[in-house]
Structures are given as structure tokens and as C-alpha cells.
Amino acid sequence: MTDSFLDKLPAGLKSKVSTIIRALPSSKSVFQELYEFALNENDDSKRKMSKNSPSDICASLEPVHEEFTIFKIEDVTILSPIRKKLNLVLHISPTTKKPLLSLTNKDGGQELTIEDLNKNISMATFLPVPEKKNIFYMFINYKESVGSKYTEPVLITINKTNILEQFKKVGLIDLEIQDFTKCIEYIRKQAILTGFRMSDPFFSVRQDSDSVPSFHVEGHRGTKEGTLYFLPDHIIFGFKKPILLFQSIDIESITYSSITRLTFNVTLITKNDEKFEFSMIDQTEYSKIDEYVKMRQVKDRSMSEELKAKTANKNQQSQNEDDEQISALEAAAQQMEKNMNINDIPVDSDDEEDDGNFEAESDLSDGSDVEAEDDYAEDDEDDEDEEDEEDKEDEENDRFEHNEDQYEEKEASLLDIEHGDSVNYDDPGQDGFSVDLGIDDVPIELDEDDEEGSGVEYD
């Protein structure tokens, strides 16, 4: 017996198996058989997967020929489960003779195929595209496609103008028809012939007054923006993956939250207690949603005990925080009473009757003390300050004028001296102003022409 299988084992496993074989040599053959069995099983699994590969199954399907085609819409934009332009075709299987729904390429190759349409398709409908009147969606939900290649819903974007032209070209509708609802009616009839139904809650001209109204609103699912469609029997949110689809009968209850002046949130709660919240819905849409909820008899749990308890807990937590802040303020006030009393002035009362007559530092810039008797005390103080300032200014002006007069007298005296006149600076009549100029008396001889009253005094 060769040891080749041991060499193919991982190092750790090889060491363990070798230890067992050395202790019990007869176990070697058992390990060999086990290895070969596992190897054969793995090869069989690979072959089965290769045979059942979805891509191989779709590739093995024959292209859809015109003789087997029931109905076809060319060049429609597929948004889900793949993104490309393809043809939507209802056709007959050449082998089983049963109707199929396929998305085919320009050569007729089937890229997605759904069989057993009456059992496999659970829901199909036409939906409007918000803010695009000439575009509409075709939405088809199914259990599985051929080969289980895709399971996500089929979402197709269709241009109304293009469909009208195609239908007129192949003679499906009269050339003079411009009403797009005629195209929808024709598509719905072809769906019924192949085993499934397509609802038309938005485009049909005939609406049952007793039926649940259909509408759509804009909202967010987390960070994803989308459209929430409320249909008679379903609720859809799309169309960014994953697309959400609910049956109305599966919605146990609904709650409204985060209500503001402009928006609010809606949470759908299913019967298995799953919650799906949609946010940022416009306030103007509330009445529509509320009417839908009441007509579908969905419970509104916005005021449930659970939510009340959550709200109460939030309020209690907020109250506790406020109480803690108040307690901290009270403690600070008590500390101020103990350590910050000024001249035994009570700080716990602002009542003027308890204040009595007291003097405190003035808030004025000069720091003067005033009596706080009435509201006119400050005005009187300001008037007194202004009068004091005016008196000071008058004194300074008088002093300046006096000095100026003295200066003029000095200047006049000097001029007299230059002209030979004598000035007595020791004269007490000059307000005690005395200046020693260092000038000696000089005798002057009297001429005969000099007369009295000349203005010169002689000693």
C-alpha cells in the first residue's frame, strides 16, 4: 500500500495519522479507503454543480424564435436583477409547450427565464415613476428563475411613447390611438393568457370606490432614498437594492415617530415582529397613510405602552439631569452663604424691606459713596459731579488769566526799561510778585529841557 495519500494531507493532519498508523499498522488501509472516498465524493459534487450551473442552463436554452413568441416589447431598460437593455418576451417552450417569461438579448438568447408562471409569479404590477410622466415601471416578483440564477424581482423601465409606436407598428392598436392605457390593457390580457395577472392601481380609468386607494410617497430607508408605494394588497419600497415587498396582510401594526413640522417617520411591524423604519416622509402625506392604515385595519401602535415607557424613561432621565443641576446650584448657594457674606449682608433675600439702610461701594467710576434711598440719588450725584468739574474748570481758567496778566505786566516793564523808564518790581501792589533782574540804579543828569510829568522819576 503506497503512502502517497499521506503526502497530500496537511502537515498537522499527516503527523496525527502517521502516529496512529505506527501505533496500529492495520489502520493504514482504513485511512486509505477514507481518503479515496472523500476524493470521489468531491469530484461528483463538482460534476453536479457543473451540470446544474445557471449560466450553462440559460446558455443551453434555445433562442426564442418568432414562431413561439406570444408578445414582445423590445429595448426596455432592465434595472433588476441585471442592468442592461433587453427584450421582454412572453413565449411558448418548444419542449414543454408551456408559457415562459424571458428577458432576451438582440439575438434571442435567454438571459433570465421564469417558468410555471401561474405558480412562480407572486405579484406583478405597473407603477408610476415620480416626477416622470412619460416613464413607468413594470414590477414582477417571482419565487425563482430557471436554474435559480436570479431571485431578485424584475424591475423594468418602459417609455410610454416608444410602446405606443411599437404597438402601432405591429398592428396591436389602431394608428389613431394616443391613449397609453390601451397598451396597458393589452399587456394585462396577454399576462392573463399565460397564467398570471398584472395589477394596474394607478393607470386604470376605472377605480372601485370601495377599494383601498393607491399612492406613493418619498422617504428614506437608512441612508438610501427611495419611493414607498402603498398598493391595495402590497407595500413596496424601492428601487435601490434590496427592494422591499410586503403583503398588506402581513403588516401587524404601524407607528409614527420623529414627528416635526415638516417630516415624520413610519415604522412597519410585521407579524413575525420584524421592524422596517422609513424616515423623512413629508407631513402632507400623513393623511393618506393614516387613511390607508385604517382601511387595511392595521393597528396604530404609536401610543402603545412600550413606546410610552420609552418616552417616560427619556423624560425621567431628563428630569434626573435637571434635578442634579438644581442640586449643584443649591450647594453652590449654601457655600456662598457660609463664605461670601459681606458686612453680614444676607444673600438669601432680595427684599428691600429686609435690607434696611446700608451703604455699599458705588458702581460709579470715582468710587464715591452714595445712599441708596431712591432712584433719584444717582441723578443728584451726577449733577454734583458736573458742578464740581465746572468749578474746577473755572478756577483753572482764572488762574490762567491771572498768570497771563502777570506775564503782560512783565513784558510791559521790560519795554519801559528799554525806553529808560524805571519799574519797581518790589511794589507790594503787584500781588507779591517780585523779580530780581540784577539791574543797578544809574544816576541820570537833569537837563533844563526836562519837565515834570515826563513819566520818569528821579531819586
From Swiss-Prot:
Where found in the cell?
Answer: Nucleus; Chromosome
**Which Gene Ontology molecular function entries are recorded, alphabetically?**
DNA binding; histone binding; nucleosome binding
Where does the record place Acidic residues bias? 347-398
Q: What ranges does the record list as Basic and acidic residues composition bias?
A: 399-421
According to the lineage, what is the superkingdom? Eukaryota
| Region of interest (Disordered), residue spans | 304-324, 343-437
**Which Cys-Cys disulphide bridges does the record give?**
none
Q: Specify whether DNA-binding is a keyword of the entry.
A: yes
Keywords, A to Z, come to:
Chaperone, Chromosome, DNA-binding, Nucleus, Transcription, Transcription regulation
Q: Does the keyword ATP-binding apply?
A: no
Its Gene Ontology cellular component terms are: chromosome; nucleus
Q: Which InterPro entries match?
A: PH-like_dom_sf, RTT106/SPT16-like_middle_dom, RTT106/SSRP1_HistChap/FACT, Rtt106_N, Rtt106_N_sf, Rtt106_PH
Subunit info here reads: Interacts with histones H3 and H4.
Its function? Histones H3 and H4 chaperone involved in the nucleosome formation and heterochromatin silencing. Required for the deposition of H3K56ac-carrying H3-H4 complex onto newly-replicated DNA. Plays a role in the transcriptional regulation of the cell-cycle dependent histone genes by creating a repressive structure at the core histone gene promoter.
> Hey, which family's this protein in?
Belongs to the RTT106 family.
Stated name of the protein:
Histone chaperone RTT106
**Gene that encodes the chain:** RTT106
